Amino acid sequence: CRLFSAVVAGNLERARGGDAGARAALVRADDLLARALLPATSLCPANPATAAQLWACLAPLPYADRFRAFAAHRAATAASPLLSAAARLAVVETRKILRRLHAPADRRDRRDALAPFGRMLGKAAAGAPLAVVAAVVAQAEPYPNMIDPCVDALRYAGPLALDCLTFVLIDRLASSGRPKLKEDGVNIADWLAALASLAGTLCRRYDGVDVRALCQYVANTLKESDPYDTLVLSELVATMAGIPPTPDLSEGQVAALAGGPTLVEAALSLSTGSRAGGARARARGAARLA
């Protein structure tokens, strides 16, 4: 993996300079990741060090190439009985962990209560990250009250698992065949609202979730005249920057938004109350969105 990551990094530099041979080498590297390295990881006993080395191979690649490798790995898993069996075992183990999650009201008690399950989930995700995070999203989507416990339980998941989580989120958001409005034709469907809330909570909590990929997905849906996924962007801004939607701003508040940070903070607090998170966390979240 160390040699592979060095080769990928070198070819990326040459590909940016227009080297056709380097671009061809990157295509072969993507194929090797999808057909060999990712499947081999899912068949080995869970080992965070192995997952970290695999992430070192993937990290230099653009997110589009990484997600393409994840999609190819998922297709290969569906076509292979051995890989499918390994994925099913990981899903069964993940569901056992998720069924035991609970969220005490006190934040410190919640952290202590979820820490053992988070460690178990992190170990499972080191072996089969794609299957594990898909099970987590499938659990949180129909049960919005499970979003916070599931996000807290991912505390010990590595960067590879979080990148797989970004891929799974975008894949489920883009899955066709599900109406994005309720039967009344006015309100957003529950599944879309839950996924948007999950995306916002994950991006606020973990830097390993790729905000650029989510924002690019929203931009692509807008180009296709699909406005409903802007709910994802709204959740990202609300949770990461602490700026919830404010439809009823007065003229004075609108004018105050053109001022400095302190004036903007005061103007928004008048309409929304106290903003989520501390000032440092909001500044870090806003910087990631910029």
Regions found by a protein language model. Give the residues of each.
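Eukaryotic alpha-helical solenoid repeat scaffolds
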Residues: 1-290
